[in-house]
């Protein structure tokens, strides 16, 4: 039995899905509100649903290339059918041979298998070089070998049926559907008509349709006619081969109509030829499609910036290109792991990055917290369309209203102008004429001004200028340092040695001691001198008193 690719989700991805599902239970779906941001030059261009896809599931589609005509009309179309049959064999035999070579390259020895596999691939490669992608595709082809063998076992019954769509389940390890685009044409044209058709008309109709289908076959395969390991068949190619009957297989594999158009655009539905039988003209294709998990609460919002007018010149907001919001949490979304379609993102993993408080506040509607960069030049397109209206920087270009006639002026201090059908029905911007059908309601903020403190330098030329100023400042500082060094060089280094410093300290202490002793001695001598003066003064006074007393006597 053929091996079946595992659809088990790896543990890290399962954890991511569980976290996202928990958030979806407690938080409503959110997206960035672009109404307060538009006048600040930040435009939300659209939202996309975020999905996770993992290991693919597979099914087989058996294309019945040769239709069965009604018995009474076989002779009529024998000539074009025979020519078509020969052309098919010539066209697809190299493909069948290449498939067989790759599938037969499997051997029991481990080392020989890789060598034979690469050799089988190189056999169908013009330059003799097998890329890793081709080796991987060939390995998948080998894995489908048993399923292809089981289909060939039922080839006679599949070729004999007149049904345009026929589910084949007997002995197959995966879902297989036999379809016949040409059989559908035969059934519609001949089996269900009541009018008689002449032989010539039957032959002409069959011949034209067979030639058209041959053209589609050559368009579908291209270089893969010689090597099935070159490229995968796209979903568009599969539809060309199987017609509308392709929907039957996709529905059986669980792809809903609401998801089908998005998956077709994603390129995740592909096919690989696994067999070709020239006897019955059956072409087997293994169809691969992803298992998709929807994150109902998560939306990816795409942001574009418009050059706005500031007092420091033209600038654009510094915001991420893609953000996602869950509840009150806004983070930057890395889309390098995702495949984008018009409405959806299909990611193998969800990777987000936290934003600074300033950017978070800006995207939450606080435009005064938005930061701008002087990176937009005058040649940048100064306008952007959104929902039938226009956001334009009318200071960078002339906003001329054709109907009603007039010039739309942008007031001083305004970052951009919001123009809708209420103010102008037909608008001319730099030679481009636009008919406006949208309208900015009252919830859109207008007349927003960008402060000088919100504009920073990030452009290459501006940064070079600022770096030049910094270099000048550094040069001036170096000159001052050189001058200081010259002054220091004049100082005697010997006087600043350790031993000299110790000597200076000791001498200073001795000097202080002698100074203190001298001060004490001086104080003592002064005290003694004053005492002597007092004694002499007393003796003088006493002698004078005695002399006065003697005189009186």
Curated annotation (Swiss-Prot):
Gene3D superfamilies: 1.10.287.2480, Head and neck region of the ectodomain of NDV fusion glycoprotein (2.60.40.1690), Newcastle disease virus like domain (2.40.490.10). GO terms for biological process: fusion of virus membrane with host plasma membrane; symbiont entry into host cell. Its main location: virion. It is found in: Virion membrane; Host cell membrane. It comes from the Viruses. The chain crosses the membrane at residues 501-521. Residues 1-31 form the signal peptide. Residues 32-500 are extracellular. The record marks 116-117 as: Cleavage. Residues 142-170, 466-491 form a coiled coil. Disulfide bonds join 338-347, 362-370, 394-399, 401-424. Residues 117-141 are annotated as: Fusion peptide. It is a single-pass type I membrane protein; Single-pass membrane protein. It holds the Pfam family Fusion_gly. Keywords: Coiled coil, Disulfide bond, Fusion of virus membrane with host cell membrane, Fusion of virus membrane with host membrane, Glycoprotein, Host cell membrane, Host membrane, Lipoprotein, Membrane, Palmitate, Signal, Transmembrane, Transmembrane helix, Viral envelope protein, Viral penetration into host cytoplasm, Virion, Virus entry into host cell. Glycans are attached at residues 85, 191, 366, 447, 471. Residues 522-553 are cytoplasmic. InterPro entries: Fusion_F0_Paramyxovir. The inactive precursor F0 is glycosylated and proteolytically cleaved into F1 and F2 to be functionally active. The cleavage is mediated by cellular proteases during the transport and maturation of the polypeptide. Belongs to the paramyxoviruses fusion glycoprotein family. Class I viral fusion protein. Under the current model, the protein has at least 3 conformational states: pre-fusion native state, pre-hairpin intermediate state, and post-fusion hairpin state. During viral and plasma cell membrane fusion, the heptad repeat (HR) regions assume a trimer-of-hairpins structure, positioning the fusion peptide in close proximity to the C-terminal region of the ectodomain. The formation of this structure appears to drive apposition and subsequent fusion of viral and plasma cell membranes. Homotrimer of disulfide-linked F1-F2. This is Fusion glycoprotein F0. It comes from Newcastle disease virus (strain Chicken/United States/LaSota/46). The gene is F.
């Amino acid at each position: 039995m053929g091996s079946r690719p595992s659809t088990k989700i790896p543990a890290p991805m399962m954890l991511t899905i569980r976290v996202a599902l928990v958030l979806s239970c407690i938080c409503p779906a959110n997206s960035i509100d672009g109404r307060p941001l538009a006048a600040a030059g930040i435009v939300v261009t659209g939202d996309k649903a975020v999905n996770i896809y993992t290991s693919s599931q597979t099914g087989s589609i058996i294309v019945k290339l040769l239709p069965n005509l009604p018995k009474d009309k076989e002779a009529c179309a024998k000539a074009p059918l025979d020519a078509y049959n020969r052309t098919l064999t010539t066209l697809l035999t190299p493909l069948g041979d290449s498939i067989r070579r790759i599938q037969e390259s499997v051997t029991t020895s481990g080392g020989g298998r890789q060598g034979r596999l690469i050799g089988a691939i190189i056999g169908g490669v013009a330059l003799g070089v097998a890329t890793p992608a081709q080796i991987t595709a060939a390995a998948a082809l080998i894995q489908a070998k048993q399923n292809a063998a089981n289909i060939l076992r039922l080839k006679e019954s599949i070729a004999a049926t007149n049904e345009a769509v026929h589910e084949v389940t007997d002995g197959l390890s995966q879902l297989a559907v036999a379809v016949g685009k040409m059989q559908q044409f035969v059934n519609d044209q001949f089996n269900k008509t009541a009018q008689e058709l002449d032989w010539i008309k039957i032959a002409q109709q069959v011949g034209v349709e067979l030639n058209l289908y041959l053209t589609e076959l050559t368009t579908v395969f291209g270089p893969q006619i010689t090597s099935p390991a070159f490229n995968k068949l796209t979903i568009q190619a599969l539809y060309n081969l199987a017609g509308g009957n392709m929907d039957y297989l996709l529905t059986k594999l669980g792809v809903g109509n609401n998801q089908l158009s998005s998956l077709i655009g994603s390129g995740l539905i592909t096919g690989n030829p696994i067999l070709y039988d020239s006897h019955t003209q059956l072409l087997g294709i293994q169809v691969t499609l992803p298992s998709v998990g929807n994150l109902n609460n998560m939306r990816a919002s795409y942001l574009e910036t418009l050059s706005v007018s500031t007092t420091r010149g033209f600038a654009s907001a510094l915001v991420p290109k893609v953000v996602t919001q869950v509840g009150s949490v806004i983070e930057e979304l890395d889309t390098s792991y995702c495949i984008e379609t018009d409405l959806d993102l299909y990611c193998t993993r969800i990777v987000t990055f936290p934003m600074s408080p300033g950017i978070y506040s800006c995207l939450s509607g606080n435009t005064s917290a938005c930061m701008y960069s002087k990176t937009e030049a005058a040649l940048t397109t100064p306008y952007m369309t959104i929902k039938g209206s226009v956001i334009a920087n009318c200071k960078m270009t002339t906003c001329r209203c054709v109907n009603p006639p007039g010039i739309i002026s942008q007031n001083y201090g305004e970052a951009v102008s919001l123009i809708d059908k209420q103010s102008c029905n037909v608008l001319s911007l730099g030679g481009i004429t636009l008919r406006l059908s949208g309208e900015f309601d009252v919830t859109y903020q207008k007349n927003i001004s960008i402060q000088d403190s919100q504009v920073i330098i990030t452009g290459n030329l501006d940064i070079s200028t600022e770096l030049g100023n910094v270099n000048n400042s550094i040069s001036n500082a170096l000159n001052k340092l050189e001058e200081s060094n010259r002054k220091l060089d004049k100082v005697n280094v010997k006087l600043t040695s350790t031993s000299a410093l110790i000597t200076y300290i000791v001498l200073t202490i001795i000097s202080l001691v002698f100074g203190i002793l001298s001060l004490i001695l001086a104080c003592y001598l002064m005290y003694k001198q004053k005492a002597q003066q007092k004694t002499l003064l007393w003796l003088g006074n006493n002698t004078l008193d005695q002399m006065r007393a003697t005189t009186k006597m």
